[in-house]
Amino acid sequence: MRLHLHRFISTSTPLRSGQNLTEKIVQKYAVNLPPNKLVHTGDYVTIKPAHCMSHDNSWPVATKFMGLGAKRVKDNRQIVCTLDHDVQNKTEKNLAKYANIERFAKEQGIDFYPAGRGIGHQIMIEEGYAFPLNLTVASDSHSNTYGGVGSLGTPIVRTDAASIWATVQTWWQIPPVAKVELKGNLQNGVTGKDIIVALCGVFNNDEVLNHAIEFVGDGVENLPIDYRLTIANMTTEWGALSGLFPIDDKLIEFYEGRLQKLGPNHPRINKDTIEALRRGSLASDEDAKYAKHLVIDLNTLSPYVSGPNSVKVSNPLSKLSQDNIAINKAYLVSCTNSRLSDIQAAADVLKGHKVHPNVEFYVAAASSLVQQDAEAAGAWQTIIDAGAKPLPAGCGPCIGLGTGLLKDGEVGISATNRNFKGRMGSKDALAYLASPEVVAASAVLGKIGAPEEIDGKPVNASPEIVKSIDLPKSSGNTGATSEEPISEDDTSEASVEVLPGFPKSIQGELILCNADNINTDGIYPGKYTYQDDISREQMAEVCMENYDPEFKTKTKSDDIIISGYNFGTGSSREQAATCILARGMKLVVAGSFGNIFSRNSINNALLTLEIPELIEKLRVKYDGVNELTIRTGWFLKWDVTKALVTVADLDGEVILQQKVGELGTNLQDIIVKGGLEGWVKSELQKEQ
């Protein structure tokens, strides 16, 4: 069970009375809640999302769905399938996969959008599946995009998607919520992309890792919806699980414009749904709690560029322009910045100019509808006349697929969202991220540069960004620590119902793996990932092998791993969770976890706890000790009935005692059933 320190709040205290906007939307889509239960950060809830989108991974989801014994999608109006990732791939194998997805969607009556229609996230916005104040999920990390229109969008893994297809629901733990205040107004030439690139660069110490974000402040009201979508989209790269903007007049105007294009009979964007937004919108309570409060002054922001090869590195364009960084390729593609306003902005820069002879410039619209609008406006032809190479609407180079990838030694600048090493081609290439305007200007200049440089004008120096971060002690989000004694009421009264078959307590010796960012390959080596015939005993033997070959000789059944921050980062391999279970370990504790690992853990019946203070205490105790795996002699007991964790040494002296969030019966049921797949099978059997 994934619980941050700020989640350590007794559910009976008045501190939990107010709800923020994220919690209120989850409240709407949570099912099977106890009477009068208000949901808050840290709570595990069963959710029935308004919609669930999958893309090229729809066939693996369908295969898992059928493997569970499911025959029919329970609510075909909930599900959307789009083909967008590998649309340039015309091989027999890929076309067969696409045909399988289309056939399955037709048989099930699922809304289906074929290759060429556009990127799934853009379609979800255009067609109103992701709509203000609803909860929409997708088996893709950039589901955060939906927050740009006030829809709580968050990613799920394939097992979750199969569960939703079969039962209409899955589970979610409400993350800590960070308030990000945008103050002031953007200067001319500064865009939404500059906001999020700057945020990723100036708050680059995982301040919002695994948080939900709510954007507030007077700076929000003047941001176009396309800017909001760009910002929400890249909250993924910032480390967040969602990025939610408020409902305001500008958003309602956006939907009125969509209504004019779609006509009066659209099932999701129509007069009734827009009028419902006008009549009353959800908003955070005055006493809502936030884990932290970040502020950035938009008046002090200038055009920013991310990279190379990291979103945590960002610099003012004025600095990089002086460095004369030659480029080989430029990209105006992706769900981040290929909407009509982006294409028009690039066209305005390119008009009357030609792409530099040493540069290849690729352009793809976010959807076929966007391309049609860009063609009608003349912007598309302007970009093509300048020398850009058109690609079909889809993900393409952003995901490292198809034409125009970066080669060894090349430098690229892109309006996309990720510039990780090797993401857009060769691992020996350098990738930068910037706004459509800067990408277009760089394509003309042959180097990273600003639009004004095309006309021979100097680039103005950038002011220092004014920013701040606050961790409010009075908010109740810091929870109870060992320096803040637990009350007698907290420790004596059992308040959590425990299902038959679920343990009332979990305990074991803490085994310290003293490192941050232990990735899934360190937990379960990649060379074993596709050995489908490997036994459970063999999985136990190789558990943590790449992290420490001695792990298997130092640990035993019922031990509890305690590690640093971002444990389980990396790939989506489920064996990273199941190999720990194979060793007889039921619980992992860490400072924080990679989100996909957290979901895979619960989905496979492995419990997790986030207790940052505990890892910090152990790091003090073992400072200077170079062993990778240490038996600490500290024992953790998690009393599930009291939602209380106690850590004591061999002599019984209490080292730490923490009140933790309640593990509800919904999650207990998944664990008892052996994971999410087992739970789904049991639900399907009930319907037979």
UniProtKB/Swiss-Prot annotation:
Which GO BP terms apply?
lysine biosynthetic process via aminoadipic acid
Q: What is this protein for, i.e. what is its function?
A: Catalyzes the reversible hydration of cis-homoaconitate to (2R,3S)-homoisocitrate, a step in the alpha-aminoadipate pathway for lysine biosynthesis.
Give one GO term, molecular function aspect: homoaconitate hydratase activity
Q: Keyword set for this entry?
A: Amino-acid biosynthesis, Iron, Iron-sulfur, Lyase, Lysine biosynthesis, Metal-binding, Mitochondrion, Transit peptide
Query: What is its pathway?
Result: Amino-acid biosynthesis; L-lysine biosynthesis via AAA pathway; L-alpha-aminoadipate from 2-oxoglutarate: step 3/5
Q: Region labeled Disordered — which residues?
A: 468-494
Top class in the EC scheme? lyase
Task: Identify the GO cellular component terms for this protein.
Answer: mitochondrial matrix
- Give the cofactor note text: Binds 1 [4Fe-4S] cluster per subunit.
Q: Where is this protein found? A: Mitochondrion
Q: Which InterPro entries match?
A: Acnase/IPM_dHydase_lsu_aba_1/3, Acoase/IPM_deHydtase_lsu_aba, Aconitase/3IPM_dehydase_swvl, Aconitase_4Fe-4S_BS, Aconitase_4Fe-4S_dom, AconitaseA/IPMdHydase_ssu_swvl, Homoaconitase_mito, Homoaconitase_swivel
Please give the organism. Candida parapsilosis
Q: Which cofactor(s) are needed, names only?
A: [4Fe-4S] cluster
- Return the protein name: Homoaconitase, mitochondrial
Q: Where does [4Fe-4S] cluster bind?
A: 335, 395, 398
Q: SUPFAM superfamilies this protein is in?
A: Aconitase iron-sulfur domain, LeuD/IlvD-like
Q: Which reaction does it catalyse?
A: (2R,3S)-homoisocitrate = cis-homoaconitate + H2O
EC numbers listed for it are 4.2.1.36
Q: Which family does it belong to?
A: Belongs to the aconitase/IPM isomerase family.
